[in-house]
Amino acid sequence: MSNNGSSPLVLWYNQLGMNDVDRVGGKNASLGEMITNLSGMGVSVPNGFATTADAFNQFLDQSGVNQRIYELLDKTDIDDVTQLAKAGAQIRQWIIDTPFQPELENAIREAYAQLSADDENASFAVRSSATAEDMPDASFAGQQETFLNVQGVDAVLVAVKHVFASLFNDRAISYRVHQGYDHRGVALSAGVQRMVRSDLASSGVMFSIDTESGFDQVVFITSAWGLGEMVVQGAVNPDEFYVHKPTLAANRPAIVRRTMGSKKIRMVYAPTQEHGKQVKIEDVPQEQRDIFSLTNEEVQELAKQAVQIEKHYGRPMDIEWAKDGHTGKLFIVQARPETVRSRGQVMERYTLHSQGKIIAEGRAIGHRIGAGPVKVIHDISEMNRIEPGDVLVTDMTDPDWEPIMKKASAIVTNRGGRTCHAAIIARELGIPAVVGCGDATERMKDGENVTVSCAEGDTGYVYAELLEFSVKSSSVETMPDLPLKVMMNVGNPDRAFDFACLPNEGVGLARLEFIINRMIGVHPRALLEFDDQEPQLQNEIREMMKGFDSPREFYVGRLTEGIATLGAAFYPKRVIVRLSDFKSNEYANLVGGERYEPDEENPMLGFRGAGRYVSDSFRDCFALECEAVKRVRNDMGLTNVEIMIPFVRTVDQAKAVVEELARQGLKRGENGLKIIMMCEIPSNALLAEQFLEYFDGFSIGSNAMTQLALGLDRDSGVVSELFDERNDAVKALLSMAIRAAKKQGKYVGICGQGPSDHEDFAAWLMEEGIDSLSLNPDTVVQTWLSLAELKK
């Protein structure tokens, strides 16, 4: 397959490796690298061959078309859209009209005959691989063409010709000029690869790192039905999975979070082929939309392949995968360096200071906030309407949109997931984007001012009006030593990977309420008694629990995912999870909750915390929480997760709740389990030594302790000004608790708001000898550095 003994015109993938980027481009070199080096490690890549850069250059040279191309490009003003479009179209037509040199055509025919020998009906993907395309510093996101379901050698030859021509797409020409690449220095290789029949199954994209935070201990997988182009283009909202690498390495269940996408359409093979019509897009049946497109076992298998690929390349990777619908086998069809996340030492924290009316919501890309007037763009022909600072609102984007995307203050799309084109480019440009909103183009109106917030977790929100927000930057190399541990309070698992990148020594308070409220939203009793609910309520709950086998499994499974995400994000550091501390009015606000909750005058002092856990009316609901903790600790092996019991009023109640935990399979000391008590009622401090007999330590809740010590309601505007954790009475109680724990050699920390708000209070706690301060994430760095200054 060479040219009269000179350099080869066609090479098989198993002849290639990363040293061949100059010959076959990054994409093809990477496929060869994996076939050659990773096949024995469980990484499956479909076989194929590649035309070389030499073949491309000879094709242009022998025909003389290269002179015409470069002369035309040299006199074209590529910033003039009309000139660029005219020149690009002319160049592509020249290439398509130029016949292949006989040596190249024969080499392709010969390779095709070998590749299709076992199946004359086999179909192939013909993809471009530019010699500079997948360099780590250049994300040429999809600038050249891909042809799918190509059958027969003549169709392959036509597709290769179109791939060659795609090196001169308008966007590719523009990108090279702006990035400083010489047109003459970039060549194109066409990869011809046996297709995986994912049109009959599912496919998607995965990253060996969390794309939003740069957290490198998880694999992030997206998946949808049909061929993978829909996920890559952002035409569907895919399913999402996070897999924890250390747990996976221990051969334990390692999926820490699953999110079901709508998956409304899919790309499949067209029944009768015409050129350019080898595939078609169709609606996905409702029953397939309502289930995950991968099993848990398949998710774990893909994650293992991602880890092997990352380990081999020695860097985070962006990987496309496909499942064969005939055999059920999982294949890797592309792998390239992950181009976006190289997290520096400077951290930015965006904070929204007020919340307005929500106009649209979708998947948050990045953690920034942007604001400005809306421009709804329905078609690329309208791109000249975008002014710098506008909020770009559209159905979805493709690489043709890049020139206007960089002008936008934020991007909002109807369709797409975290690995779609709009998401990749938004990350690259550092612009906040909310993708997969469904109907943003209908709900948002041209000219209206909006604020686009990606600073609130996985969900991004578009708010009416321009809202006030701030950004804090902090540069952190290494943090100074302190005589205590600086931990943090985390409620939202969506933010856990991001917060884990801050300096920290674990989580002193992880609240279960956020998980129950946002990830579940249904009263546990309504799920346990699902069959007794009204049909309308049953339908509402069924809609919420898609992807789970039963109402009970929905509650336990979602809790497990939330707790596991927190445990995995900070692993192996300590993560203290406080079991549910909803008050009766808060439980009543959950779907189906009203019929099960008492109407209390003062829920703050009512049916809550430990008293709820041991009551006959709630005991089996509490058992669901215990089951989730057991799965996280015993099945997944995240034994860094400890549990904390809130609002323990009496010593008898302390004894009863520890006995109940043991009955539920959470026995203190077993498998290293530590049980911490929330010290937040004056009785807890006054009888600290007696309470500590049943627990492994205290975590001081200074908010409740202050309210109860001073007898005030801090939510009442009339008396709230008296609320101060630094009051002498409160400090006396805290001193008692700290001394009692120290005397018994047990842990004592604080997780209340006080040390986050008042650095002098944090300093006092340090002098008292407290073991840890658990702070709000936005105050960790500043408080840590301030305390270090005081110690000097």
Task: Describe each region flagged by the PLM.
Residues 34-38, 210-213, 407, 423-431, ...:
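Alpha-helix C-terminal capping segments
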Residues 66, 326, 338-343, 347, ...:
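Acidic, glycine-rich flexible loop/linker segments
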Residues 1-191, 200, 286-297, 302, ...:
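N-terminal beta-alpha lobe that positions the nucleotide/phosphoryl donor
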Residues 142, 314-339:
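Conserved metal-phosphate-binding beta-hairpin within the catalytic cores
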Residues 218-318, 323-324, 363-370, 388, ...:
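Conserved catalytic alpha/beta cores of large enzymes that bind or transform nucleotide phosphates
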